[in-house]
Swiss-Prot record:
The record marks Y73 as: Interaction with target DNA. This is Endonuclease V. Pfam families: Endonuclease_5 (PF04493). PANTHER family: ENDONUCLEASE V (PTHR28511:SF1). InterPro entries: Endonuclease-V (IPR007581). Belongs to the endonuclease V family. Its main location: cytoplasm. Signal peptide: none annotated.
Amino acid sequence: MDLASLRAQQIELASSVCREDRLDKDPPAFIGGADVGFEQGGEVTRAAMVLLKYPSLELVEYKVARIATTMPYIPGFLSFREYPALLAAWEQLSQKPDLLFVDGHGISHPRRLGVASHFGLLVDVPTIGVAKKRLCGKFEPLSTEPGALSPLMDKGEQLAWVWRSKARCNPLFIATGHRVSTDSALAWVQRCMKGYRLPEPTRWADAVASGRPAFIRWQEIQR
């Protein structure tokens, strides 16, 4: 594995990320959610894509793609491991979203190219990274109150907002992926909350990927 080459690719791609609001439809008609996981001891990469109507946030379509994992787990290079399955799921959607939430980092990455940014560039769609853990940078400790907010800073640059979406839950790291500003990323996530820790697009993507009860109930209703 030529990590030097991958690192150079990340730096080059990161320079093309658009950190300004460039939505083709504002407000969007459809918002997507994406989640990636691994099965069979990491041999299989699974990506779930969901499509929600906006502003109702009603689930209208989902796709799950499973492909052979193309590279090992290497911290800092996860997007190269995850994007092939994301692309496979994306290509199955009959309707593409106007805005995509990705479970993972956007520019809040040591080389400013998390999976939300990498995939957004790949398919040229506005994306937001919604991550559950810090990858780089520092932030002031948050109060325990829901809504507590702090900028994630690295080398004098704000990379994300750290936001406690729900009481007694760890905060989310919300960042520009591509074609969405940092402040707008936070605002869009806040508009897509329904009382859970995660915004509806990535909550549904996780539910579909993992076969959670909410998704099973939804399937039963559709029959």
